[in-house]
Amino acid sequence: MITFQLEQGEKLFIPFMTAGDPSEEITIDLALSLQAAGAHAIELGVPYSDPLADGPVIQRASKRALNHGMNIVKAIELAGKMKKNGVKIPVILFTYYNPVLQLDTEYFFALLRKNHISGLLTPDLPFEESSELQKNCQSYDISYISLVAPTSKERLVNIVEQAEGFVYCVSSLGVTGVRQTFDESITDFIQQVKQLSHIPVAVGFGISTREQVDSMNKLSDGVVVGSALVKKIEELHDQLLASDTRQDALREFETYAKTFSPLYSFK
């Protein structure tokens, strides 16, 4: 289970990364860099061939990882390897529901527990259809992370009431990806979620600059950053794979990740 003990004024930084991009070994190194940059937890994305919620950046990362043979079982086992190699913060498995359905339920949850996964997030499974998954998560002491979007106001009370770990507040409709601006109605929506929630509220989908982080942190308890970090990994792809440039590339990635972390000031 995930329980964040935030100090007064402390804000969450939850980065997303695709399992196996650019390789399993480097995913572990990148996770350690994110931890060093001040991440409170890591969302580890299972690459999927039909990712409905993902924009082009994460789609490309998924394709690269799938081409290297990554799948849901290997992604879960990769989380265990991350833990063995020094990742101490919680790892949340971000997966579409179809790969989960391909596995026996008991086997899937036993695998999550064996590999020290603390949370599960299934972006394409409607809340109304998630009760079985939520029950299994509770049985295995895993937090089921709930997504809430600006379209789900009528369902908001039920979703937030049952949320665990943190509430993932979707900042805009559509797919993930870098955005320059956000709809003004997001302010009211986040405030509404905050009033209802008994756990931290983090905002994601499109956070790509420090200014956006600071802006969202004024409204919420923190941010989820995905596409911007995955894009940076894509830019550093060749340097990360080459042993003579890998350490420099990891340092560059960590420095970039710090621009989203509330632990570091860039004023």
From Swiss-Prot:
A single Gene Ontology MF term assigned here is: tryptophan synthase activity
Q: CDD domains of this UniProt entry?
A: Tryptophan_synthase_alpha (cd04724)
Pfam families reported in the protein's UniProt record: Trp_syntA
Query: Which sites are catalytic?
Result: 43, 54
Q: Does the keyword Protein biosynthesis apply?
A: no
Enzyme class of the recorded protein, top EC level: lyase
* InterPro entries according to UniProt: Aldolase_TIM, RibuloseP-bd_barrel, Trp_synthase_alpha_AS, Trp_synthase_suA
Q: Which GO terms describe its cellular component?
A: cytosol
User: EC annotation?
Assistant: 4.2.1.20
Q: Which parts of the chain are coiled coil?
A: none
Keyword list, A-Z? Amino-acid biosynthesis, Aromatic amino acid biosynthesis, Lyase, Tryptophan biosynthesis
Annotated pathway, please? Answer: Amino-acid biosynthesis; L-tryptophan biosynthesis; L-tryptophan from chorismate: step 5/5
Provide the reaction this enzyme catalyses: (1S,2R)-1-C-(indol-3-yl)glycerol 3-phosphate + L-serine = D-glyceraldehyde 3-phosphate + L-tryptophan + H2O
- The record lists its disulfide bonds as none
The subunit structure is: Tetramer of two alpha and two beta chains.
What does the function comment of this entry state? Answer: The alpha subunit is responsible for the aldol cleavage of indoleglycerol phosphate to indole and glyceraldehyde 3-phosphate.
Tell me its family: Belongs to the TrpA family.
Record's protein name = Tryptophan synthase alpha chain
Organismal lineage: Bacteria, Bacillati, Bacillota, Bacilli, Bacillales
> Which gene does this sequence derive from?
trpA
